[in-house]
């Protein structure tokens, strides 16, 4: 029988674990090579032999008393709950600004640039994000789904609905992600490499000096189709209204005073850089909105009537007696705390200074 290089002391209690038998050769210091004596007498830890279970008490090598228990490995952490995605991830999908050099509408659901791309220019946008809650997103998605279904079903009876396709603004068409919606504070802008940094500094300074603190908006302004003269698309929008500190929406002759102030500051800065203003008219306070769907077709009377009938449907997921219109007007709102400036793919966040109660701001 071959003699093992190392034989454990009989008092160590480890013979069975090491596979030695009772009739095998006894351990003797004279039988151990010098290089192994040094290892045996040294402090080399308490590693268990490879065949030992993880929780088996193992005696330290070269010692006849005391045990050391190797604790079992901790159970792997559950991966069922994922960490929340940072809202900065949404900055990649918050704006419709595109930065590709070539314009191929077939790759973007037929959408075309309002401003043709010129190498060296930076498409830009100033806006306020709204990332709907799961309940609001489900409600709006159900509205768009119903509208798509009813338009397709009614196309045979109403010629002005033939070929009309409704596209949602709630999800990115190219990636399986929910998109945050937005309130625009500028028209589509085109900045140059030379002036983009100066524009960012100036528009940030203008927003900071506006005196506007965080405020709350809801969608009591109603729902309707909107198409601008320069656009090739029609948009289904939720009209935004600011909520006063009392919880009531503004109902005076100057709706949305805070949004109007922010827009005026952005428009002034845009004009200084030769860029077009947004809503540069007397009724700008009524025109703030969030887009939830769009179509290439012009909004016909049939499309408007179908949209109204869906919004007035009294069978929502919330109540048999509450229409979608009522739910949006009374239950959906969000707090505006940040304005974002997107230049190319870079998004800068400007936090509105919180000065306590956000009182109405006088417009100029």
Swiss-Prot record:
Keywords, A to Z, come to: Hydrolase, Lyase, Nuclease, Nucleus
Q: Does the UniProt entry include the keyword Lyase? A: yes
* Any one GO molecular-function label of the UniProt entry: 3'-5'-RNA exonuclease activity
Q: Which residues bind UMP?
A: 279, 287-291
Offer a single GO CC term for the protein: nucleus
Region of interest (Disordered), residue spans: 1-120
Active site, renumbered: 182, 289
**Where would you find this protein in the cell?**
Nucleus
Ribonucleoprotein recorded as keyword: no
GO biological process assignments: U6 snRNA 3'-end processing
Protein task:
3'-5' RNA exonuclease that trims the 3' end of oligo(U) tracts of the pre-U6 small nuclear RNA (snRNA) molecule, leading to the formation of a U6 snRNA 3' end-terminated with a 2',3'-cyclic phosphate. Participates in the U6 snRNA 3' end processing that prevents U6 snRNA degradation.
Task: Give the family from UniProt.
Answer: Belongs to the 2H phosphoesterase superfamily. USB1 family.
Recorded hits in PANTHER family, A to Z, give: U6 SNRNA PHOSPHODIESTERASE 1 (PTHR13522:SF3)
The protein, known as: U6 snRNA phosphodiesterase 1
Tell me what organism the protein belongs to. Neurospora crassa (strain ATCC 24698 / 74-OR23-1A / CBS 708.71 / DSM 1257 / FGSC 987)
């Amino acid at each position: 029988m071959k003699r093992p290089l190392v034989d454990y002391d009989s008092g160590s209690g480890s013979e069975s674990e090491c596979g030695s038998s009772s009739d095998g050769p006894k351990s003797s210091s004279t039988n151990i090579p010098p290089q192994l004596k040094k290892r045996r007498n040294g402090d080399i830890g308490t590693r268990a032999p490879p065949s030992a279970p993880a929780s088996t008490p193992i005696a330290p090598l070269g010692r006849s008393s005391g045990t050391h228990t190797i604790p079992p490995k901790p159970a792997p952490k559950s991966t069922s709950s994922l960490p929340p995605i940072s809202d900065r991830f949404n900055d990649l999908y918050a704006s419709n600004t595109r930065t590709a050099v070539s314009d191929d509408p077939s790759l973007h659901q037929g959408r075309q640039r309002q401003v043709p791309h010129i190498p060296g220019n930076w498409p830009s946008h100033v806006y306020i994000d709204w990332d709907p809650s799961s309940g609001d997103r489900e409600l709006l998605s159900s509205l768009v789904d119903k509208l798509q279904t009813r338009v397709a079903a009614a196309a045979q009876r109403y010629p002005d609905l033939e070929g009309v396709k409704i596209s949602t603004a709630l999800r990115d068409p190219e990636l399986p992600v929910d998109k945050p919606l937005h309130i625009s504070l500028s028209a589509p802008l085109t900045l140059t490499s030379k002036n983009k940094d100066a524009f960012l500094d100036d528009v940030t300074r203008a927003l900071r000096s506006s005196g506007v603190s965080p405020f709350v908006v809801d969608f009591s302004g109603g729902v309707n189709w909107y198409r601008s003269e320069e656009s090739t698309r029609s948009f289904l929008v939720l009209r935004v209204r600011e909520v006063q500190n009392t919880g009531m929406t503004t109902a005076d002759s100057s709706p949305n005073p805070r949004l109007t102030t922010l827009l005026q500051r952005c428009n002034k800065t845009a004009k200084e850089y030769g860029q077009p203003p947004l809503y540069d008219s007397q009724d700008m306070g009524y025109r703030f909105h969030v887009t939830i769907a769009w179509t290439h077709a012009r909004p016909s009377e049939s499309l408007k009537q179908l949209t109204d009938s869906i919004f007035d449907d009294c069978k929502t997921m919330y109540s048999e007696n509450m229409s979608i219109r009522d739910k949006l007007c009374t239950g959906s709102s969000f707090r505006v705390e940040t304005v974002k400036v997107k230049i190319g793919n870079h998004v800068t966040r400007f936090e509105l200074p919180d000065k306590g109660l956000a009182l109405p701001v006088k417009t100029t």
